[in-house]
């Protein structure tokens, strides 16, 4: 939303077909294409820890440094995940996260946070979150800002949840492993880069085509098992971006056509896991 509201021109890149994350090869190709055209100047890269799976930050950071770009980590689904021993939310020049209830660390309403180790950026963010306040106080507005302060109630909700976050991430790994064992070789499963730990904000698989996906979703609905598509439309073809040319991003398009998510929570009972596994396997 901020990218659009700040009149930035977005240039979407494709995802990797196995991790579903930003493809460093596609990214560099897009950067070179924009530079060669000469009309626009790339300024920043936004990398998403999609579904809780850490993006490839070594490669992305090297590309950003090569071309003098800011790297922004969207860790909304990645809180609790780690990339080569380093927690998500600590990469790039700026990292953002969400505390929406469906996220790995969620409150009971809306909330979020921005992380940076740059003092100038931090001071600017403190201004933006309180209506664009200046050094003289909150009524000294020096820029157009937002009302984006996390309220005390939501912070209080998250404190005990933060204390058990690592435990919940470990529980998510156990359930993901059960799903992996059950569906391996039958559906395309999420691939986690070596040395990384996914937060598994959701557990999504790819059917072979839309017809198979629909059969699976219908079977789950008949068994009163919830399911969702994360997400049905690639970002670059949303109506909000209609003024911009829709690039050909085949991996993103295939993911949107074939993905589906099954119930997933650190507290999902083994009985419920068995029901999910049994119902999906019956349609394969």
PLM region spans:
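Short beta-strand->loop structural element characteristic of the AMP-binding/adenylate-forming
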Residues: 10-21, 228
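Conserved active-site segment immediately N-terminal to the catalytic lysine
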Residues: 73-108, 137-142
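Catalytic P-loop NTPase motifs of RecA-like helicase/translocase cores
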Residues: 19, 54, 73, 78-80, ...
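Short, small-residue-biased leader/transition segments that mark boundaries at the very start
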Residues: 1-9
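Active-site PLP attachment segment
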Residues: 90-129, 152
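Hydrophobic "anchor" residues on beta-strands that sit immediately upstream
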Residues: 69-70
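PLP-dependent aminotransferase class I/II
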Residues: 25-40, 44-48, 53, 57-59, ...
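Short, acidic/turn-prone active-site loops that include or flank metal/cofactor-
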Residues: 15-20, 77, 233-234
């Amino acid at each position: 939303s901020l990218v659009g509201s700040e009149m930035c021109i977005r240039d979407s890149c494709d995802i990797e077909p196995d991790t579903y994350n930003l493809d460093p090869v596609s990214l560099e190709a897009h950067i070179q294409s924009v530079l060669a055209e000469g009309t626009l100047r790339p300024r920043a890269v936004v990398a998403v820890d999609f579904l809780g799976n850490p993006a490839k930050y070594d490669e992305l950071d090297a590309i950003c440094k090569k071309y003098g770009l800011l790297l922004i980590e969207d860790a909304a689904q990645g809180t609790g995940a780690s990339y080569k021993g380093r927690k998500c939310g600590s990469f790039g020049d700026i990292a953002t996260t969400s505390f929406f209830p469906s996220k790995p660390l969620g409150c009971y309403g809306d909330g979020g946070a921005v992380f940076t180790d740059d003092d100038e950026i931090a001071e600017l963010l403190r201004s933006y979150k309180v209506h664009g306040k200046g050094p003289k106080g909150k009524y000294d507005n020096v820029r157009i800002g937002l009302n984006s302060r996390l309220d005390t109630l939501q912070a209080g909700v998250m404190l005990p949840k933060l204390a058990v976050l690592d435990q919940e991430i470990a529980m998510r790994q156990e359930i993901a492993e059960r799903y992996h064992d059950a569906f391996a070789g039958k559906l395309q499963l999420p691939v986690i880069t070596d040395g990384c730990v996914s937060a598994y904000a959701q557990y999504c698989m790819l059917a072979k085509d839309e017809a198979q996906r629909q059969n699976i979703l219908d079977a789950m609905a008949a068994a009163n098992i919830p399911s969702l598509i994360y997400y049905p439309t690639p970002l670059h073809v949303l109506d909000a971006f209609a003024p911009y040319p829709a690039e050909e991003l085949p991996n993103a398009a295939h993911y949107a056509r074939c993905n589906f998510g099954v119930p997933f929570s650190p507290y999902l009972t083994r009985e419920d896991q068995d029901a999910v596994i049994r119902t999906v396997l019956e349609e394969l």
